[in-house]
Amino acid sequence: MKSTRPFHPTPVITIDGPTASGKGTVAALVAAHLGFHLLDSGALYRLAALASIRYQVEPDDADALASLVDGLHITFREGCAQLDGVDVSDEIRAEAVGNRASAIAVHASVRAALVARQRAFRKTPGLVADGRDMGTLIFPDAVLKVFLTASVEARAARRHKQLMQKGFSANIDNLLQDLRERDARDSNRAAAPLKPAADAKPLDTSALTIEQSVEQVLAWYRELGQPA
């Protein structure tokens, strides 16, 4: 049955989920297939986290972090994430930066400072946005909301492979522990906790290939009467 959700002139597909659930890869491929813009909201938080490390701002100092985020010069060009004009695409994928990003994301003031930046990505012909609160907070009027899940073991294996391919050292047991801690922190924080939107479609990717996951999202989009 087709959705009766009213269409915004610029449609948004949100793909939320926990760390290493595959949402970033799926979102990028869906966006490429549809010719839509892409928002990797996690990259914004990682850029803020990297800046906090560089400028020695403590992760529990919410006011200082919000002030830092307000003044950051962040750009995305040709798939590269730039901080103050320097490409830091690889640097922000380090585990230490990811852990710091999860730690600073608990602060409502930090999340508020990044809301406008995220919503500004909504441009014609459309947007695919991935993150943790895209469907619940940033784009509640999205035409399609997907919540990706996967077992923590599958996610740790994926994360280990990603890190090794990028030249980072990684221990699978440490990754399992980090993921469990991040899941607890993300799900229990007061500001925009990680949870599926009430109208989100759940997609467990534990036993799915990337291609199968992408095709399922596109199939749901086609069910809305949209060309995909």
Curated annotation (Swiss-Prot):
InterPro entries: Cytidylate_kin (IPR003136), Cytidylate_kinase_dom (IPR011994), P-loop_NTPase (IPR027417)
Enzyme class label: transferase
Gene3D superfamilies named in the record: P-loop containing nucleotide triphosphate hydrolases
Entry GO terms, CC: cytosol
Disulfide-linked positions: none
SUPFAM superfamilies: P-loop containing nucleoside triphosphate hydrolases
Subcellular compartments: Cytoplasm
UniProt KW ATP-binding keyword: yes
A molecular function (GO) term: dCMP kinase activity
Family annotation (CDD domains): CMPK
Binding site for ATP: 17-25
Reactions accelerated catalytically: CMP + ATP = CDP + ADP; dCMP + ATP = dCDP + ADP
Keyword terms, alphabetized: ATP-binding, Cytoplasm, Kinase, Nucleotide-binding, Transferase
EC number annotated for this UniProt entry: 2.7.4.25
A single BP term in Gene Ontology: pyrimidine nucleotide metabolic process
Membership in a protein family: Belongs to the cytidylate kinase family. Type 1 subfamily.
HAMAP family documented for this protein: Cytidyl_kinase_type1
Protein known as: Cytidylate kinase
